[in-house]
């Protein structure tokens, strides 16, 4: 077990089942052993867990968190935090404003809940979700799912067996040939877009990217029940 609580402190646990924690500002924490846990809670802190089943968490302002081992979990909750889980079945979550979350392993899950956040799942059957306003979500793996639920969010499907869901008000979606796009048709006062409880769901529609009626790599939106190509 390793712990550094002072400002600018560094903490490292490399043995199996080790635990590492750095709670001071600018602190760094690393646990590379199997089942290791790493946590950096200070401002601008960095946390990394590379061992099998490792867990990594960075909760401070601009914190960075990375879990590269199998079944690893990574979470960055601070403002502009970055979270990455590259191992098999890894989970990555960034909840801060403008946070970035990426899960590249098979069955990985990636979630960005802050406004302007970015979420990407590239592994087989990965799931990617961006719930903040103007958030971007992308699923590039086979059978993956991408969802953007915030106002004017972006959702993209980069594989033929992937679904992109544009569920947020005024959200857009695109995909490659063979993929499916799902849209929610909302009615509401756009000047008060930040009040989702005032939106009214009029319906939903799913289309397949066939390369003709619905073009590849082209943004689409839904208006009055009709899926339309977005005019930038």
Task: Give the positions of each predicted feature.
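Thr-biased low-complexity repeat/linker tracts and other Thr-enriched repetitive architectures
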Residues: 1-156
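Intrinsically disordered, low-complexity terminal regions
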Residues: 93, 156, 163-232
